[in-house]
């Protein structure tokens, strides 16, 4: 896993990017985007900035919750490889939903805590009850299973539902060895529809998006991809 503090770009040779024409084709013919129809949004450097942007929009009453998210990425950003998923299931879910979004207060609320980072911010958004449906458009060279299976409904994989669960009598790390018992006695969060699109051909939208967030993600992209966020055409 690449450090979030890393400033070194990954190799252009090892990670070839689409051409300008391929990018435009995906935007226009797969997402339904157009220069003629402007959609509000923001270009961010790191993925977790999206979470704070959403929070700002929600606080300004510009975005209603829960909302649907189409996440186009080579990574699910659902906490795989991060210890935060344990914090979320054991601690964050134990407090009212309206308190969970107060990230700046975690130091006062919890003895040990993690703040949203680039690889788990969507899991935090789920814990905030912001998302009603999550579509993960993964890298077509992968199978898109880079998530913590404990976040799925009943811990069953594969699954078209995400349902976080908090058990005050058991720890999240016990799920693997006591799966049925954990979920049988747990408090369940609202279900979230979960879909994984593994082929470019399966991506089909008509441009009906309220907001678009484009992330440069310098930690995980080669410099050759920077033209996408800088292009005016």
Predicted segment positions?
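Conserved alpha-helical scaffold segments that buttress catalytic/binding sites
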Residues: 1-233
């Amino acid at each position: 896993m690449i450090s979030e503090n890393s400033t070194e770009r990954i190799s252009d040779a090892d990670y070839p990017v689409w051409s300008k024409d391929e990018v435009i084709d995906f935007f226009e013919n797969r997402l339904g985007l157009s220069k003629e129809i402007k959609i509000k949004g923001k270009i961010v450097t790191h993925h977790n900035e999206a979470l704070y942007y959403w929070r700002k929009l929600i606080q300004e009453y510009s975005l209603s919750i829960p909302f649907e998210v189409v996440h186009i990425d080579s990574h699910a950003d659902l906490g795989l490889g991060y210890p935060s998923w344990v914090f979320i299931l054991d601690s964050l879910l134990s407090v009212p939903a309206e308190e969970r979004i107060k990230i700046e207060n975690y130091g006062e609320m919890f003895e040990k805590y993690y703040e949203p980072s680039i690889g788990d911010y969507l899991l935090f958004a789920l814990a905030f009850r912001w998302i009603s449906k999550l579509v993960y458009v993964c890298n077509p060279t992968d199978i898109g299973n880079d998530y913590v299976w404990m976040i799925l409904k009943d811990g069953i994989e594969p699954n078209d539902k995400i349902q976080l669960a908090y058990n005050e009598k058991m720890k999240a790390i016990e799920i693997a060895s006591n799966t049925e018992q954990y979920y049988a006695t747990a408090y369940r969060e609202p279900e979230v529809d979960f879909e994984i699109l593994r082929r470019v051909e399966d991506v089909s939208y008509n441009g009906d998006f309220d907001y678009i967030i484009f992330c440069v993600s310098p930690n995980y992209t080669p410099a050759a991809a920077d033209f996408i966020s800088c292009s005016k055409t």
